[in-house]
């Protein structure tokens, strides 16, 4: 499934074709994108998804829940900080452009906390510029995922951080 994000506009799905293509691979037996071992290794992981878009939060929650992850969501950086303290996630996805406390500030606060500094943070953004990626690294993020992202990209990003 792909999600297109346009700054200041609504999100739109292009999921039917991707879903049909993936289903065809599984039925024909031509390379299920996520191996059984990868799915098992994701089972039980606590993941926090921080994004001001309800569509992105729901989509990530649905995809990750199907893989056995325990998913928590937050609408902005302030909400995320309280959820991090309450749930102690194994991995955090943070959107860059959010109201009140943006993704860079949120990541920086997480990485400056003695308890949570080792928690992997993956930045999410519809912007794919070198400056944005560099700024994410400066504040401590481990990886940068550009929207729209596929299920494979989302799960691959998690696998890169937990393995």
What is the predicted role of each segment?
Residues 87-93:
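Active-site beta3 strand of CheY-like receiver
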Residues 15, 149-158:
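C-terminal output helix
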Residues 68-75, 83, 145:
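Short hydrophobic/Thr-rich beta-strand motif most characteristic of the beta2 strand and flanking loop
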Residues 98:
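Receiver (REC) domain active-site loop signature in two-component systems and cognate sites
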Residues 58-66:
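Charged docking surfaces used in two-component/phosphorelay signaling
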């Amino acid at each position: 499934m792909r999600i297109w994000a346009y700054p200041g506009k609504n999100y739109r799905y292009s999921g039917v074709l991707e879903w049909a293509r993936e289903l065809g691979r599984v039925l024909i037996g031509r390379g299920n994108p996520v191996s059984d071992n990868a799915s098992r290794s994701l089972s039980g992981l606590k993941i926090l998804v921080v994004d001001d878009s309800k569509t992105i939060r729901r989509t990530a929650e649905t995809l990750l829940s199907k893989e056995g992850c325990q998913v928590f969501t937050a609408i902005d950086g302030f909400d995320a900080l309280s959820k991090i303290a309450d749930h102690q996630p194994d991995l955090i996805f943070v959107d860059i452009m959010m109201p009140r406390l943006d993704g860079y500030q949120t990541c920086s606060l997480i990485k400056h906390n003695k308890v949570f500094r080792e928690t992997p943070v993956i930045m999410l953004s519809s912007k794919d510029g070198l400056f944005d990626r560099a700024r994410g690294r400066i504040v401590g993020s481990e990886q940068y995922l550009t929207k729209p992202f596929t299920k494979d990209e989302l799960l691959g990003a998690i696998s890169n951080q937990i393995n």
